[in-house]
């Protein structure tokens, strides 16, 4: 089944609103690079939360949920595509005659709970990475317990050209991303791999809030044990720590060049 971004999906599922269910921000794609054919698509196993919006349209931080009770209690809104975003940031660097880009796509979850007895933490940020050379995806990465793991795209089953990532419970521990298996069927209520509405770092805006104001809030908010992997204080380090072999070192100038 073809992958769809959130804005193109029929909103056929509903759920009761809760205090942490912020309506999603409007789509805000980057203007300095075209990601429409390369963004990842996601599924979410039934043993974990569905994604939420980490920041509200009015700039409020999501308060998250305490990791108690049911592992999935209070964090599986059926209409989650109305209530979540994919936070994107990228950098591109020319080396010789080639252009290399690294893209991070981060999702927020209300909690990351290990067992019904507790364990884990309020808030979770997990992300996927897409690495391109001359606009062609060469590698994809998934986050797991504070690290990023890359796989050559030739080894991955595509979803109409988009790499497929699954958010799952990692054994007896907490939750993480992983690559989808060949032929894996989506478990989320929409019945297909999806991408919550993308908001890119230098394009996202709130209701009456500028891009700079929203970025400043995301840079400042404390999500406890969870970390946004593309903030100003860590994005360049993360890019260079996890760039695939053969990719040049990204620079501060390459981050600046991603601004519109």
Where are these predicted regions, by residue range?
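A domain-level signal for the mature, folded cores of soluble proteins
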Residues: 17-126, 139-260
């Amino acid at each position: 089944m073809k992958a769809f971004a959130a804005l193109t999906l029929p909103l056929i599922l509903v759920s009761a609103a809760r205090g942490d269910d912020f309506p999603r921000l409007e789509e805000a794609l980057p203007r300095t690079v075209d990601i429409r054919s390369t963004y990842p698509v996601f599924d979410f196993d039934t043993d974990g939360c569905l994604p939420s919006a980490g920041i509200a349209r009015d700039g409020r931080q999501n308060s998250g949920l305490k990791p108690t009770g049911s592992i999935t209690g209070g964090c599986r809104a059926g209409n989650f595509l109305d209530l979540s975003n994919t936070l994107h940031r990228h950098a591109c660097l020319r080396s010789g005659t080639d252009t290399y880009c690294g893209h991070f796509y981060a999702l927020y979850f209300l909690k990351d709970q290990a067992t019904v007895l507790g364990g884990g933490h309020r808030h979770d940020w997990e992300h996927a990475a897409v690495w391109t050379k001359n606009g062609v995806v060469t590698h994809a990465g998934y986050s797991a317990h504070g690290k990023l793991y890359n796989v050559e795209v030739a080894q991955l089953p595509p979803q109409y050209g988009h790499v497929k990532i699954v958010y799952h419970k990692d054994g007896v521990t907490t939750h993480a991303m992983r690559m989808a298996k060949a032929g894996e069927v989506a478990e989320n209520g929409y019945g297909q791999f999806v991408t919550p509405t993308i908001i890119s770092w230098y394009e996202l805006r709130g209701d009456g809030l500028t891009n700079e104001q929203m970025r400043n809030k995301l840079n400042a908010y404390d999500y406890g044990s969870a970390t946004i992997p593309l903030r100003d204080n860590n994005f360049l380090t993360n890019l260079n720590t996890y760039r695939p072999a053969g990719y040049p070192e990204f620079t501060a100038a390459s981050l600046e060049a991603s601004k519109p």
